Design a protein with these regions (language model features):
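Acidic, Ala/Val/Gly-enriched low-complexity intrinsically disordered segments
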Residues: 3, 9-11, 29
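Bacterial N-terminal signal peptides
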Residues: 30-42
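Generic detector of N-terminal low-structure segments
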Residues: 7-10, 20, 37
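Small beta-barrel nucleic-acid-binding modules, primarily SNase/OB-fold domains
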Residues: 6, 19, 43-298
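Bacterial N-terminal signal peptides that target proteins for export
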Residues: 17-33
Length: 298
């Protein structure tokens, strides 16, 4: 099976193709069915760039480096020709898939990044954190072709190979969240696998089962309370067995500046993204450090 990549002629980006051989389980079945129906994009084949509108504002800070992508390590990490490792900021790409085929989505994401950027020049713009604990550069990476620049994070999110992460530049958060929503609605890429779907806060056991993982959780807020230096946004009314989103009170001002009144969330439906933690025996927690992690439900 081959999934076509490319862009509009106006952008001057040559088309390339990606071999997705060797995959098993739901991914193979989905691709086979989709190709038979002429709907390859349903399973997340990267969409043509002419279907992606340019970002209203550039993601990231100043340009700090350029280089050629020499090697892909995973769906969000690559090595430049000078040996530096770069980790794409603002996105999360699964390192393990669902129980049916754990390797499918991570393998597809890495192959997608290779097809988009392998051997090409990239421009790196600063992320809020310059590097991670492993010394890898954290950056917004723009691929350069024929003088035009395309944000890799934008392409991976829009084609369903990545989710918007918990730390994202506010200048382009709305755009990337919108692209994720469209990919989710169209069941592109990882969104074709129910394992990666938005978790229901009314089923706490499903959320708790993802402890240690990045996930999206949606539900109706039962209450908002304060204690000490923390604001607690509770999906349930019990002290145990439910889900809580925590926000440090020192961060409340940044949420308010983004138009998010935390204390007015009771009774509202929200979607929160972040890392699932376990507190006590049966309570799931998500720490929200930034307003972009919380969306008001449709």
């Amino acid at each position: 099976l081959r999934v076509r990549f490319g862009s509009s002629a106006a952008a001057g980006t040559p088309q390339s193709s990606l071999w997705l051989g060797g995959m098993t389980g739901w991914w193979d079945a989905c691709l086979a069915a989709a190709f038979a129906a002429g709907l390859a994009a349903t399973c997340g084949g990267p969409a043509l760039a002419d279907e992606q509108q340019p970002l209203a504002q550039a993601c990231g800070g100043d340009e700090f480096a350029r280089g050629t992508v020499r090697r892909i390590l995973d769906g969000r990490t690559f090595v430049l020709d000078d040996g530096r490792e770069v980790r794409l900021a603002a996105i999360e790409v699964p390192t393990l898939g669902g129980p049916q085929d754990p390797a499918a989505v991570p393998k597809a994401a890495a192959a997608a990044l290779d097809a988009l950027a392998g051997g090409d020049e990239v421009v790196l713009r600063r992320a809020e954190a310059g590097s991670d604990r492993y010394g890898r550069l954290l950056a917004y990476a723009y691929i350069v072709r024929d003088g035009d620049q395309f944000l890799l994070q934008q392409e991976l999110i829009g084609d369903g190979f990545a989710r918007v992460g918990a730390r994202i530049a506010s200048t382009c958060s709305g755009d990337l969240l919108s692209r994720e929503k469209a990919a989710r609605a169209a069941k592109l890429g990882l969104w074709a696998d129910p394992y990666y779907g938005v978790l229901n806060a009314e089923i706490p056991s499903d959320v708790l089962a993802r402890r240690g993982q990045f996930a999206l959780v949606e539900g109706k807020v039962a209450s908002v309370r304060e204690s000490g230096a923390t604001i607690y946004v509770n999906f349930g009314r019990r002290r145990s067995g439910d889900i809580t989103v925590t926000v440090l009170k020192r961060n409340e001002r940044s949420f308010a500046a983004a138009g998010l009144d935390l204390k007015a969330l009771a009774g509202r439906r929200i979607r929160v993204r972040g890392w699932i933690e376990q507190r006590g025996e049966d309570r799931a927690w998500i720490e929200a450090e930034r307003p972009e992690q919380i969306e008001i439900g449709d």
